[in-house]
Amino acid sequence: MTSSVSNLLTSDKETLSLRTWTPKVKPIATVTMIHGLGEHSGRYEHVFSRFAEQGIKVNAFDQRGHGISSGVRGHSPSLEQSLKDIQLIASTAETDVPHFIYGHSFGGCLALHYNLKKKDHHPAGCIVTSPLIKPAIKVSGVKLSMGNLLGGLMPSWTISNSIDPTLISKDSAVVNEYKQDKLVHNKISLGMAKWMLQRSEQLIDLAPQFDTPLLLVHANDDKITCPKASQQFYDRVPSTVDKTLKLWENMYHEVHNEFAKEEFVTYILEWIKERIENAKNESPSSNINTTTTSTTTTTTTTTSSPVVEESKPVVEESKPVVEESKPVVEESKPVVEESKPEPVVDDSKEKEEKERLEKEEAAAKLEKERLEKEEAERVAKEAEEKRIKDEKEAQENLEKQQQEAAAAAQAEKERLEKEEADKLEKERLEAEAAAAAQAEKERLEAEAAAAAQAEKERLEAEAAAAVQAEKERLEKEEADRLEKEKLEAEAAAATQAEKERLEAEAAAAAQAEKERLEKEETERLEKEKLEAEAAAAAQAEKEKLEAEAAAAAQAEKERLEAEAAAAAQAEKERLEAEAAAAAQAEKERLEAEAAAAAQAEKEEAERLEKEKLEAEAAAAQAEKERLEAEAAAAAQAEKERLEAEAAAAAQAEKEKLEAEAEAAAQAEKERLEKEEAERLEKEKLEAEAAAAQAEKERLEAEAAAAAQAEKEKLEAEAAAAQAEKERLEAEAAAAAQAEKERLEKEETERLEKERLEAEAAAAQAEKERLEAEAAAAAQAEKERLEAEAAAEKAAEETKVEEPVQEETKVEEPVQEEIKVEEPVQEETKVEEPVQEETKVEEPVQEETKVEEPVQEETKVEEPVQEETKVEESTTEQAKPTETENKEETEEGEEVDEASNTTTEQTTTNANQPKKPNNNNNNNKGKGKKGKGKGGRK
């Protein structure tokens, strides 16, 4: 079953190639696979086609900078970005079936970190093979320091990842395919190498936080990533977690590409299926993966101004006043024409004031723009100074880092030179020690050969002595026998015949025994010859192995040989003492027994005749046979014991020496292999140091060129900044001059304004004087009219209404004046200072009305109309004559009302609040009429 390829776009606009193996039936699980460093997802076709056949869907992607995905080859900016890429791929998995994370080598490191960090996307299981927790070969401190330094300066700069293709698998076909694969590379960036080593070693410390079902697979012969680190991580994962550790024998790094790959794939599939069944049993209806999306809602609140709304009722309330005065406007056209010149004057002032305000606003706007510009220029200048300062600090840091790198490289060079000198000294000392050991070895071998020869000669002498003693014993026995024969010659013929027979048998037995002993001696000599040959062969092998042994092994050998020699010497002395004691005891016993027997036989011969001699002869023969049998058995047993002990001791010594020689040879071999590995590592380090030195020189050259270019750039920018500074200073001087002129102009306007305010104050004083005169005249006129009215009322009560109608008609000019004053109201709104002066007059009216608080409360009920009347009287001031008369009459009426003592009038004003307004209007009309008559007079 083949795979399909598609593309996904990451958050930083990189393209990831996604390879998918889809089963023909509904998937029972999904797997997100993360490949290792330098390879790509296409190398797992034979593994995941088996997964798809078993109903498991697999999504494998080429990491950024790998395979056919985009990005710098061998570069990923950070662990977090790599985990985001994994999350992007994992989000494509089905959510209704169990989801597993599978990572190999460096991908295994990412898979473990993903399960530790992405708690909201908890998978059903995690499978990691040969994970990168620690490298199999420890990275040197020089490499780490150089990598950390250069990784911070040039994170995307790529170097070789030092992976040996021959160590990925023991299958040569896999190695050849790996070498010929064009999508495989051996690159890694300095920045990625830095964070990869740092974050991988953190996994052992983070292992107690791991809570996902785990299958950890590693090969014991892995030479790329460390199997012991996997064991440590596994041991630190809590025991409550479902975890499995599988260590494969006789395999290299890629366990899925070894000869037993089918067995490996079957093992993985069985583990996954078991976890699927567990997931079904635990929560058959729950989804394994859940994605949570957060939505943020932003609410914008708009607040409207209440000022406009509050002003609407005022406008509406003033409408009826205008409508009521419409008929009057038509009748009072001459009055309107007379008051036209006044609004023109007011319009010009309003226009001037408006222009002045516009100029002030424009000047304020220009000043604001100038200040904003100055602030922006100041901020830009500070930013530029900060940038120059930062660049200078960066340059200084770069130079400092380069100096530190140079110092580190120099220190590393000195350390390597010292190590080389130490190595030469060590080799010299080892050569001297080897020569001394060889000489000592030859001396000890000579001594051992001499001791062995002496021991051999001693044993041969002892054997010859034993044979000689046995021979002498037999000869003595033979002499005794002859003596007995002489004594027995006197015996009977039958006894003689029996005796001869017995002697013949004894001679035959002795001959047989002699031949047996000679045969055994021959066999012993042959055995010694074979043992000597074996010893010589062992000695030759021993010399060959010992030639490769180390000084330490030689010292151990010397100690063991000394102990063996001491033990052999002690054993030898013990055996010699025991043999001598046994021989002496046996000799004394035989002599004693022979003497006793001879004495007994002699006594028996003397005492007895022939029977005694026969009995003695029989007893002597029996004794002889017994003694011969005992002596033969004792000699044979002693001989066998000595031979067995000697053979066992020789065999034990031989095995001991062979074991020691083999151990020493193995130790020497391991030492030589270690020295060879150290030599290769040293050569590798020297080559890397040379490359690092070359890279350093290149970087220094580039840094110098960049520094020079940056310096020239900074000088050019400084010159530009100087020009900009001069330009800004010129603009600032021009702006300061303009500001100075503006301030002088404002000062002139302020003085003009103060002059106008002084004139307005004088006009106000004049107005108050005129108002006082008008009030006095109005009061006099009012008293006169009241007197006339009282007289008329007393004369004829029936004609009261006609004057009222006439008075109503007289009021029409007043309404006409109200209409004329509408444009003045608009002028009043513009001339805000005048309104303030009008408001100041209100306390004067209140002081006038202190005696009648009821009337003051009555006036509060209609504040809008009252304010309108105040504005009308205020804006008129001393302009239209009829308006001034109206205000003077109104104030006169108020003063008259305050001083009036008539109870009826006071009661009417208190109970009917609106009538005072009508009366005021009537009084105004009367005042105007009287004033008009006075004017005509």
From Swiss-Prot:
Residues 281-937 are annotated as: Disordered. Residues 345-802 form a coiled coil. Residues 925-937 have a biased composition (Basic residues). Disulfide bonds: none annotated. Residues 309-402, 411-431, 469-489, 512-532, 600-615, 667-687, 738-758, 780-872 have a biased composition (Basic and acidic residues). One of its GO terms (molecular function) is lipase activity. Its EC number is 3.-.-.-. Pfam families: Hydrolase_4 (PF12146). It comes from the Eukaryota. This is Uncharacterized abhydrolase domain-containing protein DDB_G0269086. One of its GO terms (cellular component) is membrane. The modification N-acetylthreonine is found at residue 2. It comes from Dictyostelium discoideum. Belongs to the AB hydrolase superfamily. The keyword Coiled coil applies. Residues 887-897 have a biased composition (Acidic residues). InterPro entries: AB_hydrolase_fold, Hydrolase_4, MAG_DAG_Lipase. The active site is at 292 (charge relay system). Residues 290-308, 898-924 have a biased composition (Low complexity). Keywords: Acetylation, Coiled coil, Hydrolase.
